[in-house]
Amino acid sequence: MRPEPDKDWSKFWWLEPDVTFLNHGAFGACPKPVLEVQQQFRLRLEQQPLRFLAQDLEGLLDSVRQVLAEFVGADPLDLVFVSNATTGINTVLRSLHFTPDDELLTTNHEYNACRNALDFVAARSGAQVVVAEIPLPIQSPQQVIEAVVAKISPKTRLALLDHVTSQTGLVMPIQALVRELSQRGIDTLIDGAHAPGTIPLSLPTIGATYYTGNCHKWLCAPKGAAFLYVQRDRQAQIRPLTISHGANSPRTDRSRFRLEFDWPGTYDPSAYLSVPTAIEFLGGLLPGGWPELMARNRAKALAARKVLCEALNVSPPCPDEMIAALAVVPLPDGSYQALQTSLLNQYGIEVPIVPWPGGQKRLVRVAAQIYNTVSQYEYLAQALVKLLAAEAG
């Protein structure tokens, strides 16, 4: 699909008009109508806190869970809310018990925060972290599968894998990876931070033991909205990071899984409660709904990559099939901090320059949301050409 013609979708967001914002992938950005709904929930909470939290909230969360479950193709009984995908990863890792005989498998593309969580539980238990080295540039998703499978051993207990890598923007062949691991009796924990809203999801089809994803990134919900999916037969093992009233609730009409996660103590649930509005709003912007939005954003990311590669005279570091709404382009070696700062201060461009310690020392990572335009990527390309020329002297 061709990227859509430039159109002022940005009017629905509060983004600063004098900044060329090409970093939706960092924290997302919430549209004005969704923020208005969030504020309505906050007002309801403050008008009658007891009624809202003690009586209304449970039913409201169940309604949200139903909408979200339909979007990710899951049973609502298998979903709970967490504040972000990093929390989801920590929740699972710190609920499980490992031994010095266990190996925890991940890749060199794993998100730093989640890798830190993996290292933490490994250090605490004596387990070993094993890293599969996935090359960049990469020619095929098959290379990912081969790299991961090569690191499997009889000691491999769990694999922590990104669905879409954060630093490098690669769509991993996650269903094939889960299949390879599951066939060997290895549990899988998938960091889907960037997947909801960029890739059509059916969590049971993917087959991961555990899957967590953000709603505040590509679904454009308010900050602090994410979910954790746990296969039914593993839910008794997974406990929230905060143990509260649900731990000894006498209720039998709801699973312990829901009772514990739905009430972590007093909190503001408005971000979770706004998720259906975000899904409806984004899905209503184009005639083809979410499928068209995801396809257009992907086409826009590919167009952005083409613009940058041609301007910088470099080759794309991965095949088109491994792109969703993020794309990276290699840059000459140099300071990533200085270049990112110069882009913002001199050109008003907010875009991450990623330090990549493999085959490419620096990458520029662009995001493609509906409010972005191809002309913005052309402007970025022009700025990079000038700044890189200045670096080279």
Predicted regions and their residues:
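Pyridoxal 5′-phosphate
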Residues: M1-G393
